[in-house]
Amino acid sequence: MITISDGVSAGARQDDAGHVLADRLLVLGFEVDRASVPDERPAIEAALREGVVSHELVVTTGGTGLTPRDVTPQATLAVIDYEVPGLAEAIRAAGRAKTPMADLSRGVVGVRSRTLIVNVPGSPRAALESIEALVPTLHHALETLGGPFDHGAAGAGQEARPDLPNPEAPR
């Protein structure tokens, strides 16, 4: 998990969104490594490239808005092999149900190699709501990226990749 924030990376601000996300990802069964980088495209790109080396999922929080320093989507687009627009749309749709301001988030979801990269907003509430929007499909997405997967097999899921976290874990 990568927090993109000038204040957090400088130690001048607490990483509230990062704490909330890490807690939820742990409950979902993920091992969570955390990093923070400033709102600078080269730093974000480097952190993403480093994260995909050893993780099946990389979640970023912050830098998805409209200010000139919100460059997380541009950095992500430079790193990924392809986008998964349906997941980004699901995040925005879930947020839109709470506030029309969710449509101002430019977060991207995409894949580099076999790693899913997800951008979520920097506010703790919006970040958590974004992850919750992905819970129904996250497990299947990671299974599909993780290797051979028989999409037609009855009951394909945990049996196919028991090493993956359980998306049905309680909140």
Predicted stretch roles:
Residues 2-171:
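Non-catalytic beta/alpha edge segments that cap or flank active sites
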